[in-house]
């Protein structure tokens, strides 16, 4: 009798699953770019309204994402043009998967700068696309000539550009991204998962540029547990994407919470501003430590290069702080770690440990 594994695709058996860290109780979780606080914390009236709306949500009925009113709320909150259509996803990860499926014709190629979000390459492999990774420059800026040459040579059906980039935090220039869009015949996805921390967006161009999809999520602005992502683009493309999305891919509680949050976006925006201020404070303090290379970030995390990534990672973990060790993921990430911007107390704890490891006594004089 054949093993049941013999019926499973060989290429999938050869893959590794995405690793989610098991975080013990009491740890500061600074590895996944989550908000350090509940987005409604400190706003008792809003919390009460949220609880009442959750209690009234029709959880006995299948959700209708397209008729939920969430697209209209997103359009209003983020100035998405009327000419753009919006597709909702169970997190932007789901949309990355289905956009890949949408373009995965035999022989089609996907292009992305590297290092970047690992799920681009993963989905290319899953759906049989040729993957073209173009290395960034050593300072994590975009190697635009190399990208444009790869576009010319491989004619990718799908290109992903993370803006700002993950895991580096570095933001490519708007002119560079526009050049890639203009040079591409295929679809270009500008992945703005961290766009709220950048201050710039391609959302106003959604629906106006035929081959542009702008991808966003509510996860990084305090709602990672909701799993709500959205893609905005021209109706011709988004309409095709809608055909292959699962019919009930959102849930009633997430839809209810997201609509409420967008009606009170001023509170969410204030939380974002606080994190941006903490990011700049951390960047300034890390920059004072001469043995570190701290990369400028426009996201809610900071990437650093240290003399020994294993030593810092293990020391932080011994002190109940979990960050993301990037060392080994890509040659350009040698001895790099990614630190989510947490609460001021969490950030101070990280800074104190780094100072103990890497500051010389003369650094304090």
From Swiss-Prot:
<dbReference type="InterPro" id="IPR005861">
    <property type="entry name" value="HisP_aminotrans"/>
</dbReference>
<dbReference type="GO" id="GO:0000105">
    <property type="term" value="P:L-histidine biosynthetic process"/>
</dbReference>
<dbReference type="InterPro" id="IPR015424">
    <property type="entry name" value="PyrdxlP-dep_Trfase"/>
</dbReference>
<dbReference type="InterPro" id="IPR015421">
    <property type="entry name" value="PyrdxlP-dep_Trfase_major"/>
</dbReference>
<keyword id="KW-0028">Amino-acid biosynthesis</keyword>
<comment type="subunit">
    <text>Homodimer.</text>
</comment>
<comment type="similarity">
    <text>Belongs to the class-II pyridoxal-phosphate-dependent aminotransferase family. Histidinol-phosphate aminotransferase subfamily.</text>
</comment>
<dbReference type="GO" id="GO:0004400">
    <property type="term" value="F:histidinol-phosphate transaminase activity"/>
</dbReference>
<dbReference type="InterPro" id="IPR004839">
    <property type="entry name" value="Aminotransferase_I/II_large"/>
</dbReference>
<keyword id="KW-0368">Histidine biosynthesis</keyword>
<keyword id="KW-0808">Transferase</keyword>
<dbReference type="InterPro" id="IPR015422">
    <property type="entry name" value="PyrdxlP-dep_Trfase_small"/>
</dbReference>
<dbReference type="Pfam" id="PF00155">
    <property type="entry name" value="Aminotran_1_2"/>
</dbReference>
<keyword id="KW-0663">Pyridoxal phosphate</keyword>
<comment type="pathway">
    <text>Amino-acid biosynthesis; L-histidine biosynthesis; L-histidine from 5-phospho-alpha-D-ribose 1-diphosphate: step 7/9.</text>
</comment>
<protein>
    <recommendedName>
        <fullName>Histidinol-phosphate aminotransferase</fullName>
        <ecNumber>2.6.1.9</ecNumber>
    </recommendedName>
</protein>
<feature type="modified residue" description="N6-(pyridoxal phosphate)lysine">
    <location>
        <position position="220"/>
    </location>
</feature>
<dbReference type="GO" id="GO:0030170">
    <property type="term" value="F:pyridoxal phosphate binding"/>
</dbReference>
<keyword id="KW-0032">Aminotransferase</keyword>
């Amino acid at each position: 009798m054949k093993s049941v594994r013999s019926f499973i695709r060989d290429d999938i058996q050869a893959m590794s699953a995405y690793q989610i860290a098991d975080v013990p109780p009491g740890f500061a979780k600074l590895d996944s770019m989550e908000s350090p606080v509940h987005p409604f914390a400190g706003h008792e009236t809003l919390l009460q309204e949220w609880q009442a709306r959750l209690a009234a949500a029709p959880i006995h009925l299948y959700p209708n994402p397209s008729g939920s009113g969430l697209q209209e709320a997103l359009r209003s909150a983020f100035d998405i043009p009327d000419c753009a259509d919006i597709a909702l996803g169970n997190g932007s990860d789901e949309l990355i998967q289905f956009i890949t499926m949408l373009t995965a014709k035999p022989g089609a190629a996907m292009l992305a700068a590297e290092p970047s979000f690992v799920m681009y390459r993963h989905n290319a492999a899953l759906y049989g696309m040729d993957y073209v990774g173009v290395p960034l420059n050593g300072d994590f800026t975009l190697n635009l000539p190399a990208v444009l040459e790869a576009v010319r040579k491989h004619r990718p059906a799908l290109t992903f550009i993370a803006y700002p980039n993950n895991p580096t935090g570095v933001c490519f220039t708007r002119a560079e991204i526009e050049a890639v869009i203009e040079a591409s015949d295929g679809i270009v996805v500008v992945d703005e998962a961290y766009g709220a921390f950048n201050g710039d967006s391609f959302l106003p161009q959604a629906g106006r540029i035929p081959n542009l999809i702008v991808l966003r999520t509510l996860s990084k602005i305090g709602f990672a547990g909701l799993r709500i992502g959205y893609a905005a683009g021209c109706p011709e493309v988004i309409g095709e994407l809608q055909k292959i999305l699962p019919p009930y891919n959102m849930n009633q509680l997430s839809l209810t919470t997201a609509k409420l949050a967008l009606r009170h976006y001023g509170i969410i925006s204030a939380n974002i501003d606080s994190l941006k201020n903490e990011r700049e404070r951390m960047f300034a303090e890390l920059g004072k430590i001469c043995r570190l290379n701290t990369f400028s970030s426009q996201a809610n995390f900071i990437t650093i290069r240290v003399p020994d990534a294993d030593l810092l990672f293990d020391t932080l973990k011994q002190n109940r702080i979990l960050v993301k060790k990037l060392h080994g993921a890509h040659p350009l990430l040698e001895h790099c770690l990614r630190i989510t911007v947490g609460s001021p107390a969490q950030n101070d704890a990280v800074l104190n440990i780094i100072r103990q490891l890497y500051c010389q006594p003369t650094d304090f004089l």
